């Protein structure tokens, strides 16, 4: 990203050590990047903004009952600060990141690939397997849930086959999309705020998933 796509919102690549085997792709053992001066991660920034928002709401609880300002203007006033503008900026950086990831046509590891029927079925099977794991976990944890939520959890478990059936609709839809390399574990904790912009970190994918799955391109 920093060398070929000239994407500035990631730490600059400085070097890497690879393990190479005959007739196999090289494996990166360690990676050296530039340090990113920052004010903390964006998850903390968001929690701080939400905390201030709720403080303002509670502080104006009586006034808000008779508030006549348009909802959008009132929300901007209650959120306050720079957070709304920064959320817009983060959306722009996210789009630019994916454009950069899809920009390579020469490197096989990064070149976009067609989202064909095989890829479509693979996505469906992965989604179905993830849902199965979620239902299994929910059923196992059901006795530990607060009583207030158990009936709702049981309703979800009862609807398991219906929910899984709805996912199957994915196989009936055709698309001209492409698969590209993605971050793989993109959330606010993977972003640093510099005071003016954002730095995106940790492109190794979701650690709980197998490496073979993390290397797959997504649409």
Task: Show which residues each predicted segment covers.
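Hydrophobic core residues within well-ordered beta-strands of beta-rich domains
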Residues: 29, 180-182
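An alpha-helical support segment within catalytic cores of ATP-dependent transferases
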Residues: 134-180
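Conserved ATP-binding subdomain of kinase catalytic cores across diverse folds
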Residues: 1-143, 188, 194-219
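Canonical protein kinase catalytic loop motif
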Residues: 182-189
């Amino acid at each position: 990203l920093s060398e070929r796509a000239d994407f500035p919102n990631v730490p600059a690549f400085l070097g890497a050590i690879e393990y190479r085997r005959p007739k196999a792709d090289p494996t990166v053992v360690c990676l050296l990047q530039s340090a990113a001066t920052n004010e903390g991660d964006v998850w903390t920034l968001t929690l701080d903004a939400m905390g201030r928002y709720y403080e303002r709401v509670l502080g104006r609880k009586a006034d808000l009952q008779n508030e006549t300002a348009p909802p959008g203007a009132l929300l901007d006033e209650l959120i306050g600060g720079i957070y709304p503008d920064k959320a817009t900026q983060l959306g722009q950086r996210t789009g630019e990141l994916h454009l950069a990831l899809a920009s390579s046509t020469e490197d096989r590891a990064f070149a976009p690939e067609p989202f064909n029927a095989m890829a479509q079925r693979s996505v469906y099977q992965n989604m179905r397997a993830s849902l199965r794991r979620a239902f299994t976990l929910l059923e196992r944890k059901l006795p530990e849930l607060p009583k207030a939520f158990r009936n709702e959890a049981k309703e979800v478990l009862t609807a398991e086959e219906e929910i899984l059936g709805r996912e199957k609709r994915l196989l009936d839809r055709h698309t001209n999309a492409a698969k590209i390399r993605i971050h793989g574990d993109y959330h606010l904790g993977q972003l640093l705020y510099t005071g003016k912009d954002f730095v995106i970190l940790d492109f190794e994918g979701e650690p709980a998933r197998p490496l073979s799955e993390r290397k797959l391109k997504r649409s």
